[in-house]
Amino acid sequence: MFNLLDNYKDVNDIKKMSLDEKKQLALEIREFLIENVSKTGGHLASNLGVVELTLSLFSIFDLNHDKLIWDVGHQAYVHKLLTGRKDKFHTLRQFGGISGFPKKCESVYDFFETGHSSTSISAALGMARARDLKGEKHNVVAVIGDGALTGGMALEALNDVGYRKTKLIIILNDNQMSIGKNVGGVSRYLNKLRVDPKYNKFKEEVESTLKKIPNIGKGMAKYLERLKNGIKKMVVSGMFFEDIGIKYLGPIDGHNIKDLTEVMTAAKKVNNPVIIHVITKKGKGYEFAEKNPGKFHGIGPFNCNNGEIAATSTNTYSKVFGDEMVNLAREDKKIVVITAAMRDGTGLQNFAKEFPERFFDVGIAEQHAVTLAGGMAVEGLKPVFAVYSTFLQRSYDQLLHDICIQKLPVVFAVDRAGIVGDDGETHQGIFDLSYLTEMPNMTVMSPKCMAELTHMLKWALNQNCPIAIRYPRGGDNVYLTPLEDFEFGRWEYILNKGKIALVAQGRMVEHAVLAAEKLEQMGILVRVISACFIKPLDKVMLKKLIEEDVTIITIEDNIIRGGLGSYILEYVNTLHRKVDVINLGFKDEFVRHGKPSILYKLYGLDTGSIVDKVLKVVKLSGIF
């Protein structure tokens, strides 16, 4: 079925293939990806778009010496197939299986681990400068998408690349989402000339000869250079790169292996930084993904025959958030919403459609988004920044310096807080409590159910301070009655009997309630408290628990260090009272990829583990 792919054993095997064989291999890879990702889920559209690009990179560069870095990394599936992981592909993004991103522990050819965007050029530049300092001669290549190129970090790196003129090859994978491609005969002609090494050599010889002519030589050379640059600026979008000192080659058809290998061969001969602008199509070769690349960007299991996704719950925290923002915006014209290239992921499609003038998608620019919100707040608007937990951490300084110091009323809708599952270490939202609670003037909240999120948003938008509301991926698993009225820093009793209190936040309240029900069947009563405010703590309730000699077990989907439990312990220590406080949460480590249910059990946060912990406390303390 996959004749060429099945017989592919070494990273350099492709160098022995004819052009026709490479084209056949591309077809086999697409078929393999569609078949396998339909079962495991994953990032399909972006990988279908880089098949020929990846084959060309492996054809021209020798990964036993050269270095290849994939920005974000979710488009590295073809790379994984060609570096010995085909037989493990059925475990993609599964617990104990291969990651959906480059991982150094998986392969010596995964030279730098990625997951967040816009990092590849910086990493590649660092590796290139290390190469030069060590006197080595290999190539370093960074592959970055047009979306990731909007990130400030990528632009900072480009500025540095051009200034120092370090030899580096950058592949701009433009899937027509952000950067417009050049069209027209003149553009194609100039590109053909600039790619041809003979043209570059001829141009250098002409310039050298002209400069030797007395009186007019240097002037003529400068005139021709100005004329050439003037023409380029009119027809070639790559002049931005040229102007900052990076040679631009392109645009190139990213699905034409012959053209790709020719331009990459030419780029290898340039001793300065080069950027190759490649045009690709997301979802290439799979009709359903080509028509709807957004749907197939990150997708769960689906029917590969018709592109239909396996049935899932339609109601999620993200959808509830998006719908509520529309409702609130209809009532209050001061409400504005900001997102950083995550409109659909954060559930804001309808808001963007109904209030386009009050919706701001700033691209992959979380730092800018936070301070933009601050500026809006200063002028009396009510900004809401919707962002995944894992990406909010990119704007730490702006949160602290631009928002909290001034105590600006910005609401941060922190989506995907806690375990997100299959994307693994780079995307788990388990650090936000630790850095948000340490910021003066920041209030941190967490709803126990989707309905409670709607009331929390309405309340937060009428406060005069920065507020972060963190909520998980997916929807409710247990029905819980929402709290509708909030008092600053006050928690809620769900159950109020027993000498052990389960103090939980967010989704962990579900786990605590289910654990309490099981314990009650065993004759053990426990209290369940929803810590809807992580900061400030409900010190009144805590003092009462301590006075009643109640053992406190905190449950959070955050790392323990710096989280809810740590915050409670810090407060309890100020009271100089003997009290047992047990913290359940994630250890001081990165959480691997896997289904949330598996990860909760692994870290002792599932219902059964909570029951076991309570039983252990009961046995040791003799409370009952």
UniProtKB/Swiss-Prot annotation:
Can you tell me which residues bind Mg(2+)? D146, N175
- InterPro entries cross-referenced by the UniProt entry: Dxylulose-5-P_synthase, THDP-binding, Transketo_C/PFOR_II, Transketolase-like_Pyr-bd, Transketolase_C, Transketolase_CS
**Family the entry assigns:** Belongs to the transketolase family. DXPS subfamily.
Protein name, entry field: 1-deoxy-D-xylulose-5-phosphate synthase
Catalytic activity annotation? D-glyceraldehyde 3-phosphate + pyruvate + H(+) = 1-deoxy-D-xylulose 5-phosphate + CO2
Pathway in which the depicted protein is active: Metabolic intermediate biosynthesis; 1-deoxy-D-xylulose 5-phosphate biosynthesis; 1-deoxy-D-xylulose 5-phosphate from D-glyceraldehyde 3-phosphate and pyruvate: step 1/1
Q: What would be one Pfam family of this protein? A: Transketolase_C
Q: Which gene encodes it?
A: dxs
The record ties this protein, via HAMAP family, to: DXP_synth
Q: Give the CC-aspect GO terms.
A: cytosol
Q: Where does thiamine diphosphate bind?
A: H74, G115, H116, S117, G147, A148, N175, Y286, E366
Known partners and oligomeric status: Homodimer.
